[in-house]
């Protein structure tokens, strides 16, 4: 077949410029230079790109039709790529034409020679023609795609071509092509050519498969684009889409180098323009696939876009907003009418309808418009052009009526869509049968409008004429009147009936003619013309009837209170979450956490457990706080349910072996636990109080009047203060006398005050005063303790003042009122006044404040609940209670005193606040104290008294059972001591405390000293005289006497700090005076006056009255000096007297004359210590003036002397006020606090941090003022007993040595003495020891470790251990002696205080330093209570501790270390056991 018959351009020849270019892209036709490759190619609108030197040309091919004709009806000639643009450029930017034509992807190429043979030329054309075959041909014959080329290669045509190439020499061979040697004209006959051919064949096959995939992809895209334009399968729409697709012009891009003038004019018909190519050189037009090869128009290739598509198919009307863009004017005028104009009709918006029938309307009907309303014009701001819009309000501006939109040039990508829209606009609008226009198809479709001005295109046919729409004038309508709400007419059933409205039922019968009626009738609140009063019928019921019924039928007595759970809408604050924790109290000291956990584990899962311990000693407080996490696994409920169940079940149960019954309460937030710990610590470490009264003083019985006077109940006694001192009780006494109106409990001291806040002076005026810059003592400042009437107390820790001091109002009172309150009220007649006048609480003495604070039943936390004095005073005071114990309580208390007196041994007192004094608790107390074998358990309104048969049991009971619980009550044990019954001849003067008052009389003093003038002896007589005594507080000092007759106080002396133990009682020498000896007034109703006058103030005056047989003796008893005091208890015996005054008591002058007055006449010096080296005590007498009169038998020969008149002397307080030191009541208030604190023995806390310095001989003495500046020094163990509370038992003095070893050395070397006894003990093991050891394994003894008074910690017995019983085993690590020596040195370097090495024999040492039990804490004593033995058990040595004597609960276990004696004094260790038989040294 000729080349021209196959579509090959005849101009292409072997000498032509067309070069062979194999395919290089994914498509088969990409990169081909021959125009014939485009013939019959079904590739759609694909682009073939060819790179030129400076520009890129894109070609578009029509999708439909095998051949394309030009406007003349002929096929265009193929286009030469080299005609105007030059040789083509390969993908590597190298020219393909003149020199070489490369294959795609560098697979090889041939040189372009003009000297090819005809066979070579025809072969090249054949290959090119096969390469540009249509894609369908490639698909159909993909197997033998290049079969003809293979046959040509077999025939040797390629060899001929290669030989023809060889004539011109070697030029530009590609990669992998045949190479020839230089200078030769033939090709090498080797395997390289065959390999190159095979590789080319495989490349073509791969390219064909890629072309097939690309074709399927293009077909899929084409179908997708067709589906987008034809959503419905209607035949009309399908024909329209096929027409649009058939006449769509291909997309093309003209060359950038060609001008727009060269582009052909646009075609006016409906067919798309084709590319116009130039004719061939011979003038013949050759058909090409859309390309005209013309040298003139080669560079200017353009595309004509169709402007309109005039089809006869029916198209739905276009949207109104599209037509409005061309019909509405640009500058609309504002509307003039009130209502918006009616919208233009559809005739204006649409084209005249054509003769075609409209399509059937398948949309829902348009809703009708409201009455008297017209459709509004479309708004530009709205995206929906709905004709059924509501009327616009009057105030809003109306939208423009006519707007013109200039058209904007449309991009080529949207030309087809705009063409269809333009065609739709030009079509007439179909009409319905009735002549109305059909609504547009997108009436209910939301179409967004773009307010953009479209620039008109160059083509005039696309421009639509701009028309203005003139709206019709608005219709004149009359506005409707405003709407008024009509009155509400309720339904007939809700109409109000006449009458009050109270309806009830009566039993009236109304008979009608037929004799039928109703027994009940409803009446509108009226009966007989009167209003019926409605009453509750339950009020007429009896109590029995109201109590009948069950459940809801039972009559309710009151309204039920409804409760609701708290939520976010509740007005009350959110309550705390339900408690999930419990507080356990009353635990034994040996109860462990494991026991508590085991006890509570069955109730629920425990989340947290906190056992409270003593912060000072580390001992258990018996308080435990347990928090639950929830119920046990598998059980329903919450943690609160578990805690509630634990409280119900566990309260009152026993946990440990001690038998203590615990108390369990809910404590979700731990507040109760904190309060319980605080109270327990305060109970264990109470603030120090002044010591007890002297033991030689007796309690004076009350008279009948005093018994009738009521008193207030006492407070809880302090644990460290015994309630019963060594006192004797008179059998004839009904109750002890305290002072008028107050009953003193058994042995309670009256001078105690409650704890007070720290006293800190921050006032600048106080800082400027010299007497306030140091702690108060006997001689400091301008006001001394003796001048203010205070006794000297030993050093005490800082306590807190009562809160009443801080709550005093500062009210200024008249001067005379203040003087009367602060003075001794000289000259006041007390005859018509009350005998129990309230004293000011601010009094500087032991006034009503101290007595109230000690015996008030109110707590310190509830001061506002305490009764107050009705009169206002400038300083705090407390009012005495008007009630007291009943007569039965007093009688029972007297029986208790009698039982204690008969027992004669110390007893244990339990306050009623700790355990109620009820008879049902007696059996529980007997079980609680049965181990100590109490002789009797009695109780009164004050509490319980447990009596024992010896003097030591009470102390052991206090040490062991203190803070234990009985029936959920924590016991507070206090030991009371009693000296037992005494003869009545030895009875002393009654001792009273507090402040008493008399109805008349002034102050008088009687000072009894060692220096008194001789006086005649007073004989015993049967006559009696009445003595009235009145004792006032020294704080309200001042009298009619002169300055020289002011009572002589004790001499000033500095108070040394006290380092006594808080747990042990003070020695007899350390006990301070309980009361100061006060002034005493005695009026003896006798004729005449007599006085016992000594030197200066030593006066005993007796004033005679006017009665014929009455004498008055005034005795002014002053405070006795410290070394010269005479106990007033030796005045005489108090008995009941007979006479006119039943309340009087008779004081026999036998003791008065023999012991007191006789020594005044002799002038003998009294001993410095009254009893057993005891310091002289100060005593204050307090008795009712009218109720406690005494009769003294005196001799009538005594001549009394009239006393001298004394001038009024100002008191110290008056001097302070006059001097200006106290400016106002506030200064006096703070001074009162200072003096009250000093009275209690409190040390003030100064703001500058000053403190008292100890003596130079004290171990803690330092000169620099700071311990850090003193350096480190070692304090001997003996010296620690002087200031450590737990070391007060070490009383044995030892000589000072240079090097004193510690307990570590003692224990290290202490087991050497067992060398000799170890072997003997191991060989001579008795069966009793083995039996005791086996018994220990069965039941261990209850032991407890705590701070020891000897050294460090000690081991105490918690149960009775009889002699010979095994106590415990000394457990430790058994090592050789050499290893023990190494460990000893290691312990010394580590600073371990004790090594606890116990030598068993010469080779084995038991080391309990890190591996041991509590047995290693047993201390040494020269008087041991146990001993250590080494026994053999199954061939193994055991160290066992046995009791030598009976060990009682609370007693420390001690044994003798038996160290060998040391000759070197530096190695000797002092002994601190404090026993009576102490040797002084351990070795």
UniProtKB/Swiss-Prot annotation:
Keywords: Chromatin regulator, Chromosome, Methyltransferase, Nucleus, S-adenosyl-L-methionine, Transferase. CDD domains: RRM_spSet1p_like. Residues 1467-1483 form the Post-SET domain. SUPFAM superfamilies: RNA-binding domain, RBD, SET domain. GO terms for cellular component: chromosome; Set1C/COMPASS complex. Residues 1-478, 677-699, 805-838, 858-891, 977-998, 1013-1082, 1163-1182 are annotated as: Disordered. GO terms for molecular function: histone H3K4 methyltransferase activity; histone H3K4 trimethyltransferase activity; RNA binding. Residues 1341-1458 form the SET domain. Its EC number is 2.1.1.354. The keyword Disulfide bond does not apply. S-adenosyl-L-methionine binds at residue 1457. InterPro entries: COMPASS_Set1_N-SET, Nucleotide-bd_a/b_plait_sf, Post-SET_dom, RBD_domain_sf, RRM_dom, Set1-like, SET_assoc, SET_dom. Residues 291-300, 455-464, 977-987 have a biased composition (Polar residues). Its main location: nucleus. It is found in: Nucleus; Chromosome. It is an enzyme of class 2 (transferase). Residues 1020-1031, 1163-1178 have a biased composition (Basic residues). Residues 64-74, 100-117, 127-138, 148-165, 172-222, 816-836, 1068-1082 have a biased composition (Basic and acidic residues). Coiled coil: none annotated. It catalyses: L-lysyl(4)-[histone H3] + 3 S-adenosyl-L-methionine = N(6),N(6),N(6)-trimethyl-L-lysyl(4)-[histone H3] + 3 S-adenosyl-L-homocysteine + 3 H(+); N(6)-methyl-L-lysyl(4)-[histone H3] + S-adenosyl-L-methionine = N(6),N(6)-dimethyl-L-lysyl(4)-[histone H3] + S-adenosyl-L-homocysteine + H(+); N(6),N(6)-dimethyl-L-lysyl(4)-[histone H3] + S-adenosyl-L-methionine = N(6),N(6),N(6)-trimethyl-L-lysyl(4)-[histone H3] + S-adenosyl-L-homocysteine + H(+). One of its GO terms (biological process) is methylation. Pfam families: RRM_1 (PF00076), SET (PF00856), SET_assoc (PF11767). Belongs to the class V-like SAM-binding methyltransferase superfamily. Component of the Set1C/COMPASS complex. Catalytic component of the COMPASS (Set1C) complex that specifically mono-, di- and trimethylates histone H3 to form H3K4me1/2/3. Binds RNAs which might negatively affect its histone methyltransferase activity. COMPASS recognizes ubiquitinated H2B on one face of the nucleosome which stimulates the methylation of H3 on the opposing face. This is Histone-lysine N-methyltransferase, H3 lysine-4 specific. It comes from Cryptococcus neoformans var. neoformans serotype D (strain JEC21 / ATCC MYA-565) (Filobasidiella neoformans).
């Amino acid at each position: 077949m000729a080349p021209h018959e196959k579509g090959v351009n005849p101009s292409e020849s072997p000498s032509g410029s067309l070069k062979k270019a194999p395919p290089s892209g994914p498509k088969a036709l990409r990169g081909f230079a021959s125009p014939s490759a485009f013939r019959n190619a079904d590739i759609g609108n694909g682009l073939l790109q060819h790179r030129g030197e400076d520009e890129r040309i894109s070609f578009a091919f029509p999708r439909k039709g095998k051949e394309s004709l030009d406007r003349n009806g002929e096929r265009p000639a193929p286009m030469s790529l080299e005609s105007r643009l030059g040789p083509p450029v390969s993908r590597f930017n190298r020219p393909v034409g003149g020199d070489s034509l490369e294959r795609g992807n560098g697979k090889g190429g041939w040189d372009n020679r003009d000297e090819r043979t005809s066979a070579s030329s025809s072969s090249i054309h054949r290959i090119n023609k096969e390469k540009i075959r249509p894609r369908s041909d490639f698909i159909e014959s993909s197997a033998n795609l290049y079969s003809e080329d293979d046959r040509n290669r077999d025939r040797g045509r390629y060899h001929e071509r290669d030989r023809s190439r060889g004539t011109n020499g070697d030029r530009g061979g590609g990669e992998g092509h045949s190479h020839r040697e230089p200078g030769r004209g033939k090709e090498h006959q080797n395997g390289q050519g065959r390999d190159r051919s095979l590789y080319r064949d495989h490349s073509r096959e791969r390219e064909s498969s890629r072309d097939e995939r690309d074709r399927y992809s293009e077909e899929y895209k084409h179908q997708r684009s067709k589906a987008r334009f034809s959503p419905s399968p209607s035949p009309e729409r399908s024909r329209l889409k096929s027409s649009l697709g058939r006449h769509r012009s291909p997309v093309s891009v003209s060359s950038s180098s060609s001008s727009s003038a060269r582009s052909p004019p646009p075609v006016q018909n409906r067919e798309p323009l084709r590319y116009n190519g130039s004719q061939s050189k011979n003038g013949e037009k050759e058909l090409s696939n859309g390309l005209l090869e013309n040298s003139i128009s080669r560079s200017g290739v353009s595309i004509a876009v169709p402007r309109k598509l005039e089809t006869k198919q029916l198209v739905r009307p276009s949207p109104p907003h599209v037509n409005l863009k061309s019909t509405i004017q640009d500058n609309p005028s504002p509307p003039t009418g009130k209502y918006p104009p009616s919208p233009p009709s559809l005739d204006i918006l649409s084209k005249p309808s054509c003769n075609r029938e409209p399509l059937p309307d398948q949309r829902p009907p348009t809703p009708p418009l409201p009455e008297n309303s017209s459709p509004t014009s479309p708004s530009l701001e709205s995206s929906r052009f709905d004709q059924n819009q509501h009327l616009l309000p009057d105030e809003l501006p109306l939208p423009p009526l006519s707007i013109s939109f200039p058209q904007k040039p449309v991009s080529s990508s949207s030309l087809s869509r705009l063409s269809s829209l333009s065609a739709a606009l030009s079509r007439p609008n179909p009409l319905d049968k009735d002549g109305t226009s059909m609504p547009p198809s997108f009436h209910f479709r939301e179409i967004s409008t773009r307010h953009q001005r479209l620039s008109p295109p160059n083509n005039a046919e696309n421009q639509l004429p701009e028309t203005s729409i003139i709206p019709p004038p608005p219709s004149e309508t009359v506005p409707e009147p405003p709407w008024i709400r009509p009155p509400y007419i309720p339904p007939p059933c809700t109409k109000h009936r006449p009458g009050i409205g109270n309806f009830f039922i009566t039993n009236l019968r109304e008979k009608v003619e037929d004799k039928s009626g109703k027994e009940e009738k409803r009446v509108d609140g009226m009966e007989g013309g009167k209003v019926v009063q409605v009453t509750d019928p339950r009020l007429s019921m009896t109590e029995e009837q109201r109590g009948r019924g069950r459940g809801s039928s039972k009559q309710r007595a009151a309204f039920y209170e409804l409760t609701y759970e708290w939520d976010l809408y509740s007005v009350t604050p959110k309550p705390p979450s339900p408690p999930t924790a419990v507080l356990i109290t009353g635990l034994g000291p040996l109860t462990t956490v494991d026991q508590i956990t085991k006890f509570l584990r069955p109730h629920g899962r425990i989340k947290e457990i906190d056992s409270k311990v003593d912060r000072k000693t580390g001992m258990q407080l018996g308080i435990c706080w347990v928090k639950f996490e929830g119920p046990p696994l598998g059980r329903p409920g919450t943690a609160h349910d578990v805690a509630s169940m634990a409280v119900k079940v566990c309260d009152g149960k026993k946990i440990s072996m001690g038998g203590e019954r615990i108390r369990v309460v809910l404590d979700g937030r731990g507040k109760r636990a904190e309060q319980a710990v605080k109270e327990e610590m305060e109970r264990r470490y109470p603030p120090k109080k002044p010591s007890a009264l002297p033991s030689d003083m007796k309690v004076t019985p009350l008279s009948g009047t005093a018994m009738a006077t009521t008193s207030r109940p006492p407070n809880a006694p302090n644990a460290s203060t015994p309630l019963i001192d060594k006192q004797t009780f008179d059998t004839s006494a009904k109750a002890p006398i305290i002072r008028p109106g107050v009953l003193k409990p058994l042995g309670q001291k009256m001078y105690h005050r409650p704890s007070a806040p720290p006293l800190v002076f921050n006032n600048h005026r106080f800082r400027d005063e010299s007497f306030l810059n140091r702690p108060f003592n006997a001689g400091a400042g301008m006001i001394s303790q003796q001048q203010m009437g205070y006794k000297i107390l030993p050093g005490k820790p800082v306590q807190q003042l009562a809160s009443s001091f801080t709550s005093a109002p500062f009210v200024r009172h008249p001067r005379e009122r203040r003087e009367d309150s602060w003075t001794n009220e000289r000259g006041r007649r007390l005859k018509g006044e009350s005998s129990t006048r309230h004293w000011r609480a601010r009094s500087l003495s032991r006034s009503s404040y101290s007595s109230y604070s000690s015996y008030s039943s109110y707590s310190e936390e509830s001061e506002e609940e305490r009764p107050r004095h009705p009169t206002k005073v400038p300083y705090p005071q407390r009012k005495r209670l008007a009630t007291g114990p009943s007569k039965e309580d007093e009688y029972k208390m007297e029986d208790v005193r009698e039982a204690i007196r008969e027992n004669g041994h110390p007893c244990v007192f339990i306050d009623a606040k700790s355990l109620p004094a009820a008879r049902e608790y007696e059996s529980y107390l007997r079980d609680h104290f049965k181990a100590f074998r109490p002789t009797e358990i009695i109780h009164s309104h004050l509490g319980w008294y447990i009596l024992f048969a010896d003097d030591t049991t009470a102390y052991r009971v206090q040490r062991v059972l203190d803070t234990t619980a009985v029936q959920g009550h924590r016991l507070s044990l206090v030991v009371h001591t009693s000296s037992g019954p005494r003869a009545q001849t030895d009875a002393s003067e009654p001792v009273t405390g507090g402040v008493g008052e008399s109805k008349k009389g002034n102050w008088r003093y009687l000072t009894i000293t060692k220096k008194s003038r001789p006086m005649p002896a007073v004989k015993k007589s049967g006559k009696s005289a009445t003595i009235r005594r009145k004792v006032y507080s020294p704080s309200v000092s001042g009298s009619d006497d002169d300055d020289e007759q002011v009572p002589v106080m004790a001499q000033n002396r500095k108070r040394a700090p006290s380092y006594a133990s808080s747990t042990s009682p003070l020695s007899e020498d350390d006990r301070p005076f309980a009361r100061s000896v006060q002034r005493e007034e005695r009026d003896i109703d006798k004729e005449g006056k007599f006085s016992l006058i000594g030197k200066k103030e030593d006066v005993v005056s007796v004033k005679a009255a006017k009665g014929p047989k009455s004498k008055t003796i005034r005795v002014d008893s002053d405070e006795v000096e410290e070394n010269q005091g005479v106990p007033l208890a030796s005045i005489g015996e108090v008995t009941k007297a007979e006479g006119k005054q039943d309340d009087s008591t008779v004081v026999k002058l036998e003791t008065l004359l023999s012991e007191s007055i006789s020594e005044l006449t002799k002038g003998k010096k009294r001993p410095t210590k009254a009893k057993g080296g005891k310091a002289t005590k100060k005593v204050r007498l307090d008795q009712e003036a009218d109720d406690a009169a005494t009769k003294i038998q005196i001799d009538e020969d005594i001549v009394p002397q009239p006393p001298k008149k004394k001038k009024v002397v100002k008191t110290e307080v008056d001097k302070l006020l006059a001097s200006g030191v106290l400016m106002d009541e506030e200064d006096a208030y703070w001074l009162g606090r200072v003096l009250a604190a000093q009275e209690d023995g409190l040390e003030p806390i100064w703001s500058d941090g000053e403190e008292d310095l100890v003596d130079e001989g004290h171990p803690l003495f330092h000169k620099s003022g700071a311990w850090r500046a003193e350096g480190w020094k070692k304090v001997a163990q003996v010296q620690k007993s002087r200031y450590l509370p737990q070391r007060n038992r070490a009383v044995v003095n030892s000589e000072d040595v240079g090097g004193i070893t510690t307990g570590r050395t003692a224990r290290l070397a202490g087991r050497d003495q067992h060398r000799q006894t170890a072997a003997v003990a191991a060989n001579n093991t008795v069966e009793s020891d083995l039996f005791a050891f086996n018994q220990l394994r069965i039941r261990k003894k209850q032991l407890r470790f705590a701070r020891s008074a000897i050294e460090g910690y000690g081991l105490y017995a918690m149960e009775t251990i009889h002699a010979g019983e095994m106590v415990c085993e000394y457990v430790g690590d058994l090592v050789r002696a050499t290893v023990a020596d190494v460990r000893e040195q290691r312990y010394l370097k580590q600073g371990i205080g004790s090594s606890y090495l116990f030598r068993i024999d010469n080779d084995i040492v038991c080391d309990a330093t890190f591996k041991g039990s509590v047995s290693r804490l047993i201390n040494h004593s020269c008087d041991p209570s146990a001993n250590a033995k080494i026994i053999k058990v199954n061939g193994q040595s055991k160290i066992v501790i046995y009791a030598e004597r009976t060990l009682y609960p609370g007693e420390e276990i001690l044994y003798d270390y038996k160290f060998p004696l040391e000759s070197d004094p530096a190695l000797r260790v002092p002994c601190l056991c404090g026993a009576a038989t102490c040797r002084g040294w351990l070795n």
